[in-house]
Regions:
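Adenine nucleotide-associated cytosolic modules
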Residues: 1-259
Length: 259
């Protein structure tokens, strides 16, 4: 793929980076990324991936824009309240970069559609806000050998990691960290607990950085590490994630059974 004159100008600040250059930008333009959720995390992920020139971006979300979303879901606007989030996000991304292909999936990700959707993309960025989706993505990205970049939010904190458990030893999955979802109601959702809107922006932007690094093969990966952000104390810290040999998704027994 040869860059056009317009692309040379648009991506000029990428092209002057030795770590990116023309070859890296061509990788981004050829990449296909599925973003799960067009909410607080998904908004900055989508905006930065589109601006960076990720060639095809899939968005899956079955929700509609609500006025309460606009405090943190910056890919949407007041005039789009009531619209499907995937349509609202597509309009915003087209205004940012009309050279990017946006594929919308106005549905809830579930066992009946997830495998077919994920199979069509190179990488999955999880911006969802529920445990069922998180565990479904964990299991299917392992099975389909797709990198999974995932973040989670609480009122003043965020967590972020990258998962490539299909690479074997030293590469844990989400279930190695949290084997099973917590009991229903134990962890309140955003509409119950609240959130400082900019915290979602910080974590979604960091997630976009990790997606771009994964696509470009740059720097250190968060694979095997959980990054935790504490906004009130202005702290980041990292926790190593050990690969669980008994993990029901990627453990030794599972690998032996499927090999």
């Amino acid at each position: 793929m040869e860059l056009t004159e317009e692309q040379f100008q648009r991506y000029a600040r990428h092209l002057i980076l030795d770590e990116v250059g023309e070859e890296g930008q061509e990788k981004l333009l050829a990449a296909r990324v599925l973003v799960v959720g067009a909410g607080g995390l998904g908004s900055p992920i989508l905006l930065y991936l589109a601006a960076a020139g990720v060639g095809t971006i899939g968005i899956i979300d079955d929700d509609r824009v609500d006025l309460t979303n606009l405090q943190r879901q910056i890919v949407h606007a007041t005039k789009r309240v009531g619209e499907l989030k995937v349509d609202s996000a597509r309009a915003t991304l087209a205004a940012v970069n009309d050279g990017v292909r946006i594929e919308t999936h106005p549905m809830r990700l579930g066992p009946d559609n997830a495998a077919d959707l994920i199979a069509g993309y190179d990488l999955v960025a999880d911006g969802s806000d529920n445990f069922a989706t998180r565990y479904l993505l964990t299991d299917l990205c392992y099975r389909l050998k797709k990198p999974l970049i995932a973040a989670a939010l609480s009122p003043f904190e965020g967590q972020l990691s990258s998962f490539r458990p299909y690479l074997g030893d030293g590469h844990p999955c989400y279930r190695c960290l949290f084997r099973e979802p917590p009991p229903p109601g134990l962890v309140p959702r955003c509409e119950e607990a609240g959130i400082l809107g900019a915290v979602a922006g910080v974590m979604g932007t960091l997630e976009a950085v990790e997606v771009l690094k994964e696509l470009l093969g740059l720097g250190d990966s968060l694979d095997g590490t959980l990054l935790i952000y504490d906004a009130l104390r202005v702290r980041f810290h990292r926790i190593r994630i050990a690969k669980d040999p008994d993990c029901p998704t990627c453990g030794v027994t599972v690998g032996a059974a499927t090999s």
